[in-house]
């Protein structure tokens, strides 16, 4: 953990005290993002989930959607757990940790990453698309993709599959036709192969520089729920602007707590306002 994140973690207790003192028992709704979790990191992730469960309730994607749509009340601080990209470790985590705890997660899958069988091609795809700053020969050996069998297992055990484009492209760099293909062709593949209807979509990368108005408009025509990488609370929110907090298994519980108490939310206010302006432009 870098120095800034270590320092930031010390704000957890003051922020928690302030929130409890000034906002009382007003419930909060937040979404977590994880990516690959290696076997060496599994115990850390398990400890994070155990710690979070003491103060937060984990919702299923269906419960989360019902709250976002105003059909169910938000009664207490709640979390939705999401995983991005479609790494094979996600199935292992579901089997070993989530399923025994009856925690249901939302897995955003890059459809072009599914069913790559050659290890070299898999590493090349990760380097070219998911982590473009990482050379293919530096991709960790454990970074592999789920296939359709793995995704079917997740569905069978009560989890939800979401769309994450065809190739994990930075949508802001594409024209409308290319954006349409990335979003819709990728989703069509997953729906056809898995026999499901996909309602949830997450932007690749998730930052404001990777998104534009065209990608928002095209995604809105296909999906009810659209997820960003902007940190923030979701208790009163449009379903096309869902905030998420990204974490790693080696993050301390106090760093996680600081973010969930809203320690970085103000940083994203201007970004979120800019994103909302796109929806208002006719």
Regions from the language model: what does each represent?
Residues 1-82, 88-89, 173-176, 180-282:
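C-terminal active-site subregion of NodB/CE4 polysaccharide deacetylases
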Residues 32, 76-79, 99-209, 236, ...:
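Metal-dependent polysaccharide deacetylase catalytic core of the NodB/CE4 family, i.e.
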Residues 48-55, 97-101, 157:
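A short, Lys/Arg-enriched amphipathic alpha-helix followed by its capping loop at the start of a domain
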Residues 85-92, 97:
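Short acidic, Gly/Ser-rich segments with clustered Asp/Glu that frequently serve as metal-coordination loops
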């Amino acid at each position: 953990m870098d120095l800034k994140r270590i320092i930031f973690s010390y704000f957890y207790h003051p922020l928690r005290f302030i929130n409890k003192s000034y906002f009382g028992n007003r419930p909060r709704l937040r979404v977590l993002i994880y990516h690959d979790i290696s076997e060496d990191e599994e115990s850390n992730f398990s400890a994070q989930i155990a710690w979070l469960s003491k103060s937060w309730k984990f919702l299923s994607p269906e419960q989360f959607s019902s709250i976002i749509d105003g059909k169910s009340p938000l009664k207490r601080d709640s979390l939705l757990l999401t995983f991005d990209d479609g790494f094979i470790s996600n199935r292992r985590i579901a089997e070993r940790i989530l399923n025994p705890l009856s925690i249901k997660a939302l897995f955003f899958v890059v459809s072009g990453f599914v069913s790559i069988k050659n290890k070299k091609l898999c590493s090349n795809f990760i380097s070219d698309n998911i982590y473009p700053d990482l050379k293919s020969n530096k991709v960790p050996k454990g970074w592999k993709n789920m296939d359709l069998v793995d995704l079917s297992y997740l569905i069978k055990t009560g989890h939800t599959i979401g769309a994450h484009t065809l190739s994990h492209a930075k949508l802001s760099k594409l024209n409308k036709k290319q954006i349409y293909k990335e979003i819709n062709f990728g989703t069509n593949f997953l729906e056809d192969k898995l026999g499901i209807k996909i309602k949830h979509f997450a932007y690749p990368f998730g930052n404001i520089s990777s998104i534009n108005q065209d990608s928002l408009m095209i995604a809105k025509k296909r999906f009810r729920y659209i997820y960003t990488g902007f940190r923030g609370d979701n208790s009163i929110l449009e379903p096309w602007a869902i905030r998420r907090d990204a974490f790693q298994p080696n993050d301390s519980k106090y760093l996680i707590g600081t973010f969930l108490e809203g320690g970085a939310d103000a940083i994203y206010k201007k970004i979120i306002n800019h994103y909302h302006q796109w929806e208002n432009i006719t």
